[in-house]
From Swiss-Prot:
Keywords annotated in UniProt: DNA-binding, Homeobox, Nucleus, Transcription, Transcription regulation
GO cellular component entries: nucleus
Stated family: Belongs to the HD-ZIP homeobox family. Class I subfamily.
Pfam families the record matches: HALZ, Homeodomain
Protein name according to UniProt: Homeobox-leucine zipper protein ATHB-5
Main location: nucleus
Biological processes, Gene Ontology terms: abscisic acid-activated signaling pathway; positive regulation of DNA-templated transcription; response to abscisic acid
SMART domains documented for this protein: HOX
Organism expressing this protein natively: Arabidopsis thaliana
Residue spans of biased composition, Polar residues class: 23-33
Keyword RNA-binding: no
């Protein structure tokens, strides 16, 4: 031992030691024990590259020096993975008692079960985030499309509003012009009407139409004959009506013609004297022209009415 030390010391004396300022300081390589037990957050970094089938590495105990030289890789079986998936669906959080129970049932170490649950939660969160991102992305795209369509509709409506405003302005100008023209026409008409009224007022008033006071005797006679019918219509005597030949002779005799002329003259004289007016009410003279009295009104005093002349 002394020789070895002496030899080593003697060799170290011959070897030159050079200190270069340009060399970078190299950090010491981390030990296995320091990497494994540096903290609880290092588990996620160590198992990020594990496969989805649940492969795990058996790193052995801490105090065994031979574990770093010969690392054995273990893979979980299909049945073990299915059982762990079912338990994860029930509850993704693993308690210590549940961890030990699952390890005993599946033939695994509790640390392996804990690591599998941790990795599975990380993948589940990633998938959940991806699903949420997809939903949000689809909603965003739909909202963007709706916003674009609404923007287009808004632009079209704004254009229509501008067109309507322009039309309203044009129609307003036309309406103002038309109103001005109508007012001018009305003013001209009122001026013309006033001028006509003034002209009529300056003119001399025209005399009223002349109404003739003297009417022809023929018209008066016709009116009297229309008021007083023929005497034959008022005869109610059965003795006179029985003698038809006497009636015919009476109508066509020359005395009858003279009597008719006398009656016409009498009616003309009565009309000129004002005995009967044109506005006599027939209701007041109903008894005057009823029966034999109507027949005797003119015939009693006439010579031709006597039956002795005809009998002789």
């Amino acid at each position: 031992m002394k020789r070895s030390r002496g030899s080593s010391d003697s060799l170290s004396g011959f070897l030159p030691i050079r200190h270069s300022t340009t060399d970078k300081q190299i950090s010491p390589r981390p030990t296995t024990t320091g990497f494994l037990y540096s903290g609880a957050g290092d588990y996620s970094q160590m198992f990020d590259a594990l496969e989805d089938d649940g492969s795990l590495e058996d790193l052995g105990g801490v105090g065994h020096a031979s574990s770093t030289a010969a690392e054995k890789k273990r893979r979980l079986g299909v049945e073990q993975v299915k059982a762990l998936e079912k338990n994860f669906e029930i509850d993704n959080k693993l308690e210590p008692e549940r961890k030990v129970k699952l390890a005993q049932e599946l033939g695994l170490q509790p640390r392996q079960v804990a690591i599998w649950f941790q990795n599975r939660r990380a993948r589940w969160k990633t998938k959940q985030l991806e699903r949420d991102y997809g939903v949000l992305k689809s909603n965003f795209d739909a909202l963007k499309r709706n916003r674009d369509s609404l923007q287009r509709d808004n632009d079209s409506l704004l254009g229509q509003i501008k067109e309507l405003k322009a039309k309203l302005n044009v129609e307003g100008v036309k309406g103002i012009e038309e109103n001005g023209a109508l007012k001018a026409v009305e003013a001209n008409q009122s001026v013309m009407a006033n001028n006509e009224v003034l002209e009529l007022s300056h003119r001399s008033p025209s005399p009223p139409p002349h109404i003739p006071t003297d009417a022809p005797t023929s018209e008066l006679a016709f009116e009297m004959f229309s008021i007083f019918p023929r005497t034959e219509n008022f005869r109610d005597d059965p003795a006179d009506s029985s003698d038809s030949s006497a009636v015919l002779n009476e109508e066509y005799s020359p005395n009858t013609v003279e009597a008719a002329g006398a009656v016409a003259a009498t009616t003309v004289e009565m009309s000129t004297m004002g005995c009967f007016s044109q506005f006599v009410k027939m209701e007041e003279h109903e008894d005057l022209f009823s029966g034999e009295e109507a027949c005797k009104l003119f015939a009693d005093n006439e010579q031709w009415y006597c039956s002795d002349q005809w009998n002789s």
